[in-house]
């Protein structure tokens, strides 16, 4: 399963849907995240002044054995295509920069994507959580 920044942040920040997202991650055989999404998540986490948030991020990545996948040239092209098809200003899904890399990784590995919100549900990506 591919993990988007939104899902990981919801767990780290103890948001309302944390139990559902955490359960999906624990039940997955393998968890992957694009290096671009990992950095995106780290930037958000590091903006919090609470050191416990940073510790939760680092610990969670270790406990879940989250695989940080390098961005390939193919991912770069897929991310651009995702932006052209589903990005802000192009489509109601309004995928942002990070979303496009999560999309590309899900396509590369042909794995469902765990995310929070409704942006990806308006694309052709397979969601990890079904409605």
Language-model features: locations:
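A general structural signal for well-ordered alpha-helical segments in protein cores
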Residues: 18, 38, 54, 76-80
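Acidic, PIN/NYN-like endoribonuclease modules and their adjacent C-terminal/linker elements
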Residues: 103-131
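Glycine/charged-rich beta-loop-alpha catalytic/anionic-binding loops adjacent to active sites
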Residues: 22-23, 59-62, 83-89
């Amino acid at each position: 399963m591919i993990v988007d920044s939104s899902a990981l942040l919801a767990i780290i920040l103890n948001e309302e849907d944390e139990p559902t997202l955490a359960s999906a991650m624990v039940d997955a055989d393998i968890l992957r995240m694009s290096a671009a999404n990992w950095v995106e998540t780290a930037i958000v986490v590091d903006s919090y002044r609470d050191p416990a948030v940073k510790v939760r991020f680092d610990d969670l990545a270790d406990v879940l054995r989250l695989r940080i996948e390098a961005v390939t040239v193919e991912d770069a092209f897929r991310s651009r295509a995702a932006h052209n098809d589903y990005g802000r200003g192009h489509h109601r899904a309004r995928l942002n920069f990070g979303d496009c890399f999560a999309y590309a990784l899900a396509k590369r590995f042909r794995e469902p994507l765990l995310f929070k919100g409704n942006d990806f549900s308006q694309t052709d990506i397979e969601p990890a959580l079904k409605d």
